[in-house]
């Protein structure tokens, strides 16, 4: 009796679904790509319970004829390719004919569609891949696909789904990438009836960037363009002053398809050269048009990995495009922004924005902000600050109408000598935290400061001889113990902000942070949703200096986004290490005598003054005996050959 049999089609589709449909975001990606291939200009994505309960995609594309609807659920049935030659000239996003039958096999699926020229449309209902009914229906041209009870017959897959907020963040990220890849399509994303994302579909990529990442970010993006006989590269990259803590803000597109490619990422970084700080990444949208014959997209189930011929030439093209665009820009950060931070708070902030200070719901509020920015709005220059007298008049005139300040991400000032905390290296981080927890109080010698070298090292003398102190490591230790005490046992005292801050994030980060907000609350940072992917901060803990608020809150949020699961205790410890490093004086910074002596006094009061939080030494000691040996005032006793002969 034969042992090898052909699997039933439904079972084969369920197996394929394991590769194609990883989570609700995979369903959104596949169905939206089909809608784009159908020539849609308007696509609406509606989800309930982050897509696990319901996903509905509505488009105004060409629709399907009645005879094609049932065929679309057959495996490898597609209108995209017809022969082997088409496989090497793929210009559509889908082509295998696997996605729709795979999705149907693990859900309850309803298709309502109508093609142009047909009297009636078609409604098809399927459960677990089996068609239950197909009837004519009156419906406009286009397609509406509803996926309900996803993974209902694959409980193991459903069991390992993440939280609703995490799954929703993945959906938002997919829609954002597709919006950047196809700015000519108007996208609308709704979750439980509330609008999360909407793009205008004008075809202007900068407008799409503004809609997804915010107007402030779009203003700091520069256009790139380059081409040769095989490739055409265009898009936008951020100025070096605008960076993020991870690569998630880099979008690489090939013929309208979002891909992941390490070497092309490397080319983007090379284009910046030394302009990027260590551990920081730019925001970039790189659109690559290529002859389909040079790209093989049939190498991965999700089609996000592409093999490219002449990849080195493409890397060089991207690198030169970015380098050339940055050379043409004025890369000196706007000094007015720094002046505004150091000048009188009310006089400068009162003219920076006119957003009303009010509570709003979790999602986009159309009455508060105009989502559809115009090219003129995006391109406009930042208006110069008004004079001091004008500011004073404005402050008096508007004292009854509070305003908010848009928080800005400061240029990264991490110390390359001490490196960057690797939050994903759990074993290394655990050892570091254990060492810091087990520190014992020790005595510290009395030191008399007498000089500084290269703005980096302090010289002091004591009974033990000469001491050389690394000023950055010393202050890092002082600040670490300060933050560890303030953050570890949080003082719940809060200071009300006269002018609240607005913190803007991408859609997916905004949703992820909502889920992790209790951790921020544990360190007395209370961010309230303000709509349009923005949080508002109305008060701050008294241990945090007001001038640190903008950078510190963004750094805290970036740390949360980089970690998957972390306890409150670990988060507080990591936060103390990060803030102590960021807030400490750096090398090549000259200290006056008073500041140097004060630093040594503070260092002597530390529980462990000998090492920075990363474990590096704070100071080294040369005893009087060491010095005398170096100058050969004391010489080692020489052993004679006669003495050696005795042994």
From Swiss-Prot:
TM annotation in the entry: none
NCBIfam families xrefs: mutl, PRK00095.1-3
Record-linked PANTHER family: DNA MISMATCH REPAIR PROTEIN MLH, PMS, MUTL (PTHR10073), DNA MISMATCH REPAIR PROTEIN MLH1 (PTHR10073:SF12)
One GO biological process term: mismatch repair
Name assigned to this protein: DNA mismatch repair protein MutL
Pfam family, one: DNA_mis_repair
One annotated Gene Ontology cellular component of this protein: mismatch repair complex
Keyword line: DNA damage, DNA repair
The gene coding this protein: mutL
Record lineage: Bacteria, Bacillati, Bacillota, Bacilli, Lactobacillales
Location of region: Disordered: 393-423
GO molecular function, a single term: ATP hydrolysis activity
Compositional bias ranges of the Basic and acidic residues kind: 409-423
HAMAP family: DNA_mis_repair (MF_00149)
Protein function: This protein is involved in the repair of mismatches in DNA. It is required for dam-dependent methyl-directed DNA mismatch repair. May act as a 'molecular matchmaker', a protein that promotes the formation of a stable complex between two or more DNA-binding proteins in an ATP-dependent manner without itself being part of a final effector complex.
Protein family per UniProt: Belongs to the DNA mismatch repair MutL/HexB family.
InterPro entries, A to Z: DNA_mismatch_repair_CS, DNA_mismatch_repair_MutL, DNA_mismatch_S5_2-like, HATPase_C_sf, MutL/Mlh/PMS, MutL/Mlh/Pms-like, MutL_C, MutL_C_dimsub
